[in-house]
């Protein structure tokens, strides 16, 4: 019995061994060591009987125990490899246990903002009272609101520029390029962590960074030296083999991944690309793939840092920041997808979702009205050179409008010098400035019911600025050849493809990046505030109970473009929450802002994948201003859920999705004693529909930290409390 008892103790020890061993992610071996422990226990019960002297037996058992544990420790520590994602996260871990599914806090090395989300991020940063950023590098980009049809955008840009100068942030001026393209070229470093107030920040994964899109307040906290919190993600291995066929592109790779996984298939996951096929892709091609990983709902996507990465950095005169990074050979992944690059064909994402993917042959003959080439997904030097090659000596079809936006000043300069830009112009292309432009509905809206081929990353309904526009997401190669024919055209009809190589040396000119003032001079810098700059909206601690009406009920896959539209008319209001809130949800219900404001406080009910798309925290701040106290849905998109918590809005999900049908717009909903329940760490709450008398179980899944944020009334108030301690 003694022997059996001791082996039972070993069994328990093995289940808890992860707390004794360094964070080699021992938990992954739980099946291995639990089976081993069970076998030992069973063996002890059946085979051993205590027949020897007590002391002799105890000594023998102790020796066996020591040897056994030593062997098990050595086996687990030696054999368990790490994924690339785990290596970087582990190196940056500052809070929490390195255990899958748990919340962890990581140190952030770099941040980026763009101007549509940046104004609010810097207002939030100022409110924290931290005099100078504490990151290794923070950069503010002006690339969204570049259509200055009124004073608002120009005023906001002056505000951002002055904040940057005062607080230690680099400022990329209008015209220097799209944030993700420029950051990849000039600031990205393998192995570093980056968060940005734009959902396509994972572009940095193409250079081997853990690069994550986040809300502006999360970025502000990181600039102040705070950790960024995520749930330890599942890690999906995408094993690439073979080589892309002529005229098949990196865009087709990510469209294939979207076709397989869907727009919510990546939620809670990091997509890690591995395999021999990786070597055949350049850094800009890899960045195209990681960029659109955002459309999977993934936390981020990442490629290894290898000789190809080194070649790119050398060409940018930044070889000194390179380091080789890859997963261990015996790394264990949660899922695996295998893609033979040689088997891929030209693909297109059809209206109105990036995962509505079909081959060009499946779509068939399709008359088009417009082609737009550019965006942070496909505006690199090689993308532009391919387009110029296809257009050279030809003319755009008379029925098609072709617009091209190079991704950065560097790219624009180089294609201007080598003649590629002249070839585009001669063919009939309209050249736009190096900015986001049409991708965010900032100009170039298609005609009514117009069919537009775009090399962008999103084709949500109405995002183009034309509500009934039919937007197809395609590669630059398909876009260019289709502009010539007037129909959706397979680029493989072009025949042999010439080799397009990255240059050995890019043209380096960082004169449009303004460095901050020296720390000694920062106090003399005046922050410039125009009349469009309004303070962060007031928040309040979580109420004792919530008793209010449902002001809006919406369906599945509601995007942040539905919640807080973009476009040339609305984007200039991003620093003015009272004004921009008047457009909240108007694409779904024009009366919502007035109705919600009149109710004083209310609840929104939605379907699955609520809040997918852009990282814009305005999709939480505008509802906050309109009195929204809670959002009850089937499931949330990651970034939007975090933004709701940061705004102090309670995120709730149905226990049973069928209960969605038991609540209607206008119903009165009660969450009694909700504050006490949250304080008591109760994850299962009860919503009472007073209108119908039905009780509905809901989940309120908060960690210790996010619970405190909700109780405080949002991340800004929570951070102020922490800084005051």
Task: List where the protein language model places each region.
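Flexible, polar/acidic helix-loop-strand segments at domain edges
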Residues: 5
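Low-acidity, Ser/Thr- and Arg-rich intrinsically disordered low-complexity segments
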Residues: 8, 22-23
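Hydrophobic, low-acid, alpha-helix-prone terminal segments
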Residues: 10-13
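Short, positively charged and aromatic/hydrophobic N-terminal segments
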Residues: 15-17, 22, 33-39, 43-44, ...
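Family-specific functional microsites
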Residues: 28
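Fe-S-dependent hydro-lyases/dehydratases of central metabolism
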Residues: 77-725
């Amino acid at each position: 019995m003694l022997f059996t008892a001791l082996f039972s103790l070993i069994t328990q020890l093995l289940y808890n061994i992860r707390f004794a061993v360094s964070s080699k992610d021992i938990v992954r071996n739980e099946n291995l060591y639990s089976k081993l422990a069970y076998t030992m226990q069973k063996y002890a019960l059946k085979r051993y009987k205590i027949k020897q002297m007590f002391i002799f037996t105890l000594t023998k058992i102790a020796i066996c125990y020591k040897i056994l544990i030593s062997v098990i420790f050595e086996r687990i520590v030696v054999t368990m490899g790490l994924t690339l994602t785990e290596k970087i996260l582990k190196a940056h871990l500052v809070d929490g246990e390195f255990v899958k599914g748990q919340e962890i806090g990581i140190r952030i090395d770099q941040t980026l903002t763009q101007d549509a989300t940046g104004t609010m991020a810097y207002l939030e940063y100022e409110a924290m009272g931290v005099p100078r950023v504490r990151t290794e590098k923070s950069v503010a980009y002006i690339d969204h609101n570049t259509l200055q049809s009124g004073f608002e955008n120009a005023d906001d840009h002056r505000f951002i520029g002055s904040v940057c100068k005062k607080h230690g942030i680099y400022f990329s001026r209008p015209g220097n390029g799209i944030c993700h393209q420029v950051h990849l070229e000039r600031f990205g470093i393998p192995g570093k962590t980056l968060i940005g107030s734009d959902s396509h920040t994972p572009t940095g994964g193409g250079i081997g960074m853990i690069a994550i899109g986040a809300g502006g307040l999360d970025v502000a906290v990181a600039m102040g030296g705070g950790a960024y919190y995520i749930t330890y993600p599942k890690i999906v291995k995408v094993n690439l083999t073979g080589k892309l066929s002529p005229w098949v592109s990196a865009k087709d790779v990510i469209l294939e991944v979207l076709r397989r996984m869907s727009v919510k298939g990546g939620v809670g996951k990091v997509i890690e690309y591995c395999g021999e096929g990786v070597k055949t892709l350049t850094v800009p091609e890899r960045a195209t793939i990681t960029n659109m990983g955002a459309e999977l709902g993934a936390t981020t996507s990442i490629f290894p840092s290898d000789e190809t990465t080194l070649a790119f950095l050398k060409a940018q005169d930044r070889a000194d920041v390179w380091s080789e990074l890859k997963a261990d050979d015996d790394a264990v992944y949660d899922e695996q997808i295998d893609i033979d690059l040689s088997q891929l064909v030209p693909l297109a994402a059809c209206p109105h979702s990036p995962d509505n993917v079909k081959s060009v042959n499946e779509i068939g003959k399709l008359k088009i009205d417009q082609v737009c080439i550019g965006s942070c997904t496909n505006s690199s030097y090689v993308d532009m050179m391919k387009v110029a090659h296809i257009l050279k000596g030809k003319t755009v079809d008379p029925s098609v409008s072709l617009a091209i936006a190079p991704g950065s000043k560097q790219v624009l300069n180089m294609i201007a010098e080598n003649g590629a830009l002249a070839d585009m112009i001669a063919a009939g292309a309209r050249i736009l400035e190096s900015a986001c432009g049409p991708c965010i509905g900032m100009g170039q809206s298609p005609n009514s019911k117009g069919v537009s081929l775009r090399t962008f990353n999103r084709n949500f309904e109405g995002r183009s600025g034309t509500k009934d526009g039919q937007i197809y997401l395609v590669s630059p190669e398909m876009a260019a050849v289709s502009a010539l024919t007037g129909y959706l055209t397979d680029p493989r009809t072009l025949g042999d493809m010439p080799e397009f190589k990255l240059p050995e040396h890019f043209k380096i000119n960082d004169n449009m990046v303004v460095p901050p003032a020296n720390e000694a001079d920062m106090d003399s810098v005046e922050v410039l505030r125009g009349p469009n700059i309004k303070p962060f909206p007031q928040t309040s601690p979580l109420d004792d109970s919530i008793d209010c009406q449902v002001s809006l009920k919406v369906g599945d896959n509601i995007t942040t473009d539905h919640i807080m539209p973009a476009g040339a008319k609305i984007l200039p209001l991003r620093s003015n929450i009272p004004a921009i809130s008047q457009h909240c949800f108007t694409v779904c219900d024009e009366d919502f802002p007035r109705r919600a404001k009149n109710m004083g406080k209310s609840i929104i009910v939605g379907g699955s994948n609520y809040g997918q798309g852009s990282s814009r925290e305005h999709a939480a701040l505008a509802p906050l201003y309109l009195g929204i106290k809670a959002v009850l849905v089937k499931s949330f998109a990651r970034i939007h859920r975090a933004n709701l918590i940061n705004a102090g809005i309670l995120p709730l999900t149905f226990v049973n999705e069928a209960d969605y049908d038991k609540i209607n717009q206008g119903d009165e909903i009660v969450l009694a004693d909700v504050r006490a329940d949250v304080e008591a760490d109760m994850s299962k709450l009860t919503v009472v529909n007073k209108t119908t008398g039905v009780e509905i179980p809901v989940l309120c899944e908060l960690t210790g930290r996010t619970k405190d944020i909700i109780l405080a009334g949002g991340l800004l108030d929570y951070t102020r409390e922490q800084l005051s301690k």
